[in-house]
């Protein structure tokens, strides 16, 4: 314990802590302790010395005159010696020794026996009450003595009345008093130790709960202490003394909150304590009002220093003192709800909702004041939503999470306006920062796997099934289309990316023997899922593809095995959480036997429809099994659904399913299907979920009888196609997706991550929208697959398969991989600060020093000076080797732009052909760089880094929670957020350790700091590339290369879309595996 190490009682050469008073610290030198606690001494001599010191102190105590300064100093000095002797004795008593057979042997602790038998502590307390202005100094020494005895004797002394009675007296007299800081610290430490002892010995709890009441009444009768200010004699004195320190800063507040949590945990074991805290203490209102006050102190606008900032990270919390205090209070409330008695928990949740969430957090998110909207800027909206996102990511207790879910869906507290609807509207914001923060918040909400939230966002618009034509509804539970969907997503890859893969993939023996002319007439189609892994090469190091873990570089880019691993893990996690839902939203088969009334009702509805609109009943039985009678109405999808009116043959009946909502209760689902999953349509585990307090917030309590729908409302299905709405949430997401090529890179990263998170849900209804390309969608907006087709056509039109397009794609791909490495280096810098935190001075180094530092670079060094390489299949080149003079530039057209130099510049010649050219190519800085080369000759003949004139904007990680392989593999990734419970880790896939780029502790680095992480030289060359492409573009360099800004943006979108399609293909395949597994169980 830190307090014991720093205690003056353990230091033989120092005076007592605090002396008699703060004004007499110079007298501490008079109180030298000649022996240490661990010193071997004669027990008899120690006992004699102890009695002698007490006798001398008692002589001073017996003086009738008011104590003087010398009297108090003398008593304190003797008391200090007595404490030291007690330490020596307790040290020897705690040693393991054989029991003595001598009946006449002395007691094991004679000094302690004397202390208790003579009531020394009681006498000392009575004298301390008469010391007047020296009362605090004497009280401090008393607290030190009790602290020492409690820590060394554990619970044994608490059973002795000579020890317990004066302890209770001094605690009772401390109520309502204001003490100096040193005395407060000792008091909180003593209370903390008492809570630890009581937690380990619950049978002693009644001593402090009831004996305290008796002692207070006794002291009131004797006139020693005034009546307690609380107005009640029922008192848990330890808890009452800790309450004033609950919102204190620093170590004092932490120790007080730890002790209060122990008291809350004690309430679970003793119902009297729980009743007292809930009914007689003010802890719950105090916590909630303090939380609201701390929230009001938070900054109204957060300074955004990076271009891709989207949420508050733990580093941001530590850098903002007000936010640190607020998070400490919030985490304490979360812990109280977790460990406290049910009465305390419910009271705190009620106060939280009525006293903080609704009146404080609600207006802040809605930007309202007294019910009226006030003019605010974007920064205040961003900060309010960031705080809400941080709160949702920080709390873990189901009770609190359920309160926040209720807050998002409440329509009564905010004049009919729901918080969730306002958040959905902000998805359409033209401001990129607000849009990214909003999508990050929805990523957190979807990561909660809450049934009510999913019902309000998606499912209630999809449950009627109007978005799926009748003729396609029987396909929902089929398995094969999932595999076809994987091929569908891979085929949607832009043509220029397909061509790049064709050029990069080694040719087979058959292709090498084919004539050269046949190659151009019949291009090779890329394999969707290669049967055998093979190393794939391209003209740049950024195009080194990683199939199933076999890769030539350290990037996780295009690692299909990582995508499959990520999809499998995320789907399994989501499935486990959704198993606890009260209902399963699935397509349920019509029963084959029984329920003839249901069949008769369906046929009757069909006859009524045709008699009204068709003039007669349909000839259902007369049609042959192989014919399909089509309706004459205009069909928006593949069919109008007319053929679905007839009963399907037996071979189709097994797969034919119609949309209903399973309203089976949790207990029925648990009895009938114990091991089934949500993907197979079972709400299993409901009985366990009902008994698990920790998952109730995920379960919806909506009346499911209101959701019963009639699947055979044919007239509405046939005549309302094309007008079905998927809800404002999906409409906003689809709207952002339609402007994919116009969005910023970071908006697209969050957008793809949000859709990917939806695809993880094991719900066939969502799969019909996202993963099932064979199911037509009839809605008022283009379907997801239609939007993907439009994006492919748009990219193919703007990036035709030409040599220039392939070069731009290579540059875009390399830049995204370089971004991945920068994120990895930033994370490694956080985790391994001794190796990466030092920022080297930006001085000119000799060529030999540069080579030595280049050899010390880690495998995750940035790719700023790397150049394209012509690699064969057996090439074993190192993509991170910086001193390879055989490397070529990207192309002759690009190298020609940098070929004109007024003076030779050997140190920077290698650097001028790597990603520095890529950055220049992206930002159109060719002419500017050429012009600047002559101007930089004064600085050692090296050009100045971009970052010296650029902004301080740099990139941070897209996630505050750890991600699995594919999220880092895409680097361009999905902005996914895990449950807060996972930790940063490395996942070994395909025999290689893959460091994940998503992390929670993200530090923003400048360009020079990134190179300091790599251990590379800090020279004024192109090795000091800017932190991001956007920061280079922000310098205002006018584009002068062959590629326009629009072309470069489309190239980035094409590479991002290509990687995202691979991830969706992996998810579709893994979902099919889950569905097969569930059906076999």
UniProtKB/Swiss-Prot annotation:
Keyword list, A-Z: Phosphoprotein
Biased composition (Polar residues): 1-11, 857-876, 954-963, 994-1010
Pfam families on file: DUF5917, KELAA, RAI16-like
Residue numbers bearing the Phosphoserine modification: 508, 833
Compositional bias segments (type: Low complexity): 657-668, 840-856, 891-913, 933-953, 964-993
Stretches for region Disordered: 1-31, 504-524, 650-685, 830-913, 933-1027
Family classification: Belongs to the FHIP family.
Protein name, entry field: FHIP family protein GA25918
